[in-house]
């Protein structure tokens, strides 16, 4: 069972704005200014220009930090760079490290950039060692990130408890999504037992009003992180299959079998059952063509009130899991 409770636009790609050592991926005089010279205006919307500028700035292999080698941060990074002609992860050095240590790693010259959820990118900016290059939303505008996952046998044996978990996540997301809850949420998360960070830095991520560099430049990203609107927590099987398709291609796995298994992991049936009776407007479908929604679009739903946000990939590709499977079967025959 999988129930997403956060959307990857809350992630950001952060770049060192200091000089690096001779063995770094960027030349000694590289940094934020060189990327601007290479055409990146830090407008937070153009992932193609940002990626091309980053690739052009490298002298050797880029060193990029991610929280886990198998994570949405890594998948977005691989998709982005590979689409621009830099094979990933083969063409870059991916370093796994805890998010709270990433700003320190940038400062120490251990990595050139990192991709992780906020507020850790903003901490690099606060410490004067990094700049925010672009949000994950500019790579895939409505991608999944975090999951609530349990074993399928446990979900079957503990139907009541698993349903309560789903409802708790749903209600929490709905509350956090309310703008009036942001300041309190930031204050709670700032406590020493949680993030132990200034609440104003956390609030930036919740609002999407970001300071992106030590120059004090600001960018506002609508929907930077989503907790509720647009069926944000709905476990779309097509999103699970997109992840499986990427992994299968990179690791040499059977694509058809990978997509089949991925569809069994995301469980919209459990999600619907857990939220039945609370007047929540859920999608009528459990899968969709990923990357096909250009503007907010009404879709078939239980009460006819649901609108899905844009879900475009930066390169305008789409992913249709059914077509992918049909193509694989046809190729076999």
Task: Label the model's feature ranges.
Residues 1-89, 95, 112-125, 129-142:
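Short, glycine-/small- and polar/acidic-enriched structural segments
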Residues 129-158, 166:
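Periplasmic-binding protein-like
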Residues 161-272:
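Secondary-structure end/capping motifs
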Residues 241-333:
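Conserved C-terminal helix/tail region of periplasmic/extracytoplasmic solute-binding proteins
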